[in-house]
Amino acid sequence: KEKLQRMAQTLGIAPNVIFTGKMTHDELLPILSKSKALLVNTVKDNNMISIVEAIAVGTPIVTTDVPLNSTYIKDYQLGIAKKQWDESDLNDVVSNSEMYIENCMKYRYKLSTKQRVEQFLEIERERLDDGKK
């Protein structure tokens, strides 16, 4: 954490960066919903609930192509997901924030429990219908 804080100071962005440390879910969501983007720079963690939570509150994602979520982030334009992102990608998310936020708000239903149950029931209906033929 200290190394990142020093880097933020060196880059002159410290006033615009918040290092929160560990937070409860209730503490996180209000901050996440006001954020320009959720930045996830991972090389191995491939299934992150924080990405789903960010999309659910309309916060665009900037991540590597490692998380499983990266596929639908790219497909539905919920943010940037690529091997190496940089300042131009961050500028893109900020400059086009309305589009990314709107896309997140439209997509979040697909991540809901209700949608997952409906998908399961549809698959089961199709299976039963195929058995009748």
Specify the residue positions occupied by each region the protein language model found.
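A short hydrophobic beta-strand element within the catalytic core of glycosyltransferases
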Residues: 39-40
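Short alpha-helical donor nucleotide-sugar binding micro-motif in glycosyltransferases
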Residues: 22-23, 30-35
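Short hydrophobic beta-strand element within catalytic cores of glycosyltransferases
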Residues: 60-63
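Short alpha-helical segment that forms part of, or immediately flanks, the ligand-binding pocket
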Residues: 29, 51-56, 70-71
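A charged, aromatic-enriched C-terminal amphipathic alpha-helix characteristic of glycosyltransferases
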Residues: 98-131
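Aromatic "clamp/platform" in nucleotide-sugar-dependent glycosyltransferases that forms part
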Residues: 43-44
